[in-house]
């Protein structure tokens, strides 16, 4: 009896699970979260996504970095093989659409304050958001994140209003529901809480509580965050489709079929496998045997 009371006291002493973590786990876990960011300079773009993941998704206690064998099982080579099989079966169009689909129950779209302030960068952001809208599961949670310099709250407010207006223009009535906006200031913990709170509102409005049907399955990689930087190559839709389907280019993928993904591990490591890989028309082809990172 005494032991049972001690165990009960220990359980009560433990802090309650944060709502953000609980909602993410209910939606399938952090392995189902997708980060999307602007592509302006490769290393800086990747660093921003990596640092954001570290700040908003702190390392889990005892989380270990997956080994190369586990990463290989879910690597882009497997996706390419599946797509080639689909094309051989005469389902090239359906396979391409499925490959581009975003099945994540929670998507973060990061943009810089400078991109919202000028007309042309803002137009590119709108195009990026429309691309994400067309690929994401209808009604899935999405958080637009304004990346701003640390400063007074009123200094961030104008940029946040611009982002909210852009989200309303692209997502319509979903803005304020499953589509939310938040400001993130690197190095400012309070802004991480604001991003998490926005994600909670989006997940609750989206009715998150069950893993998404048909969501990604990453054997051996339960704590993996996937992210990609969206650049001009992502906008080349439906170009040279017939050429890509020809037998002479059977092994070449359309840009829509393979995105340069940057895997963010729970401990925040983000190694660039692009080194030594081939690049063609903005598409990064990762080696067949990843050494700790995917696209």
Swiss-Prot record:
The lineage of its organism: Eukaryota, Metazoa, Chordata, Craniata, Vertebrata. This is Uncharacterized protein C2orf72. Pfam families: DUF4630. InterPro entries: C2orf72-like_C. It comes from Homo sapiens.
């Amino acid at each position: 009896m005494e032991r049972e009371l001690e165990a009960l006291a220990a359980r009560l002493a433990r802090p309650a699970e944060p709502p953000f973590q609980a909602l993410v786990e209910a939606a399938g876990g952090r392995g189902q979260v997708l980060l999307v960011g602007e592509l302006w300079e490769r290393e800086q773009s990747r660093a921003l996504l990596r640092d954001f993941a570290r700040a908003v998704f702190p390392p889990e206690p005892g989380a270990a970095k997956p080994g190369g064998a586990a990463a290989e099982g879910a690597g882009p080579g497997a996706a390419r093989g599946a797509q080639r099989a689909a094309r051989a079966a005469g389902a090239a169009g359906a396979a391409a659409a499925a490959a581009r689909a975003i099945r994540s129950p929670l998507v973060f779209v990061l943009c810089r304050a400078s991109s919202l302030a000028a007309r042309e960068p803002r137009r590119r952001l709108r195009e990026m958001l429309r691309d994400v809208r067309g690929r994401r599961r209808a009604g899935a949670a999405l958080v637009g994140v304004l990346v701003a310099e640390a400063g007074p709250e009123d200094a961030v407010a104008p940029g946040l209003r611009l982002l909210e207006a852009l989200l309303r223009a692209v997502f319509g009535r979903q803005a304020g529901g499953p589509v939310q906006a938040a400001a993130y200031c690197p190095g400012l913990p309070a802004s991480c809480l604001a991003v998490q709170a926005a994600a909670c509102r989006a997940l609750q409005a989206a009715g998150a509580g069950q893993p998404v049907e048909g969501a990604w399955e990453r054997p051996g990689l339960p704590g993996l965050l996937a992210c990609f930087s969206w650049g001009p190559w992502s906008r080349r839709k439906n170009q040279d489709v017939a050429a890509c389907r020809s037998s002479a280019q059977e092994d070449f993928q359309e840009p829509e079929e393979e995105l340069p993904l940057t895997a963010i591990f729970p401990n925040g490591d983000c190694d660039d496998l692009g080194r030594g890989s081939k690049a063609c028309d903005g598409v990064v082809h990762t080696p067949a045997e990843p050494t700790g990172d995917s696209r």
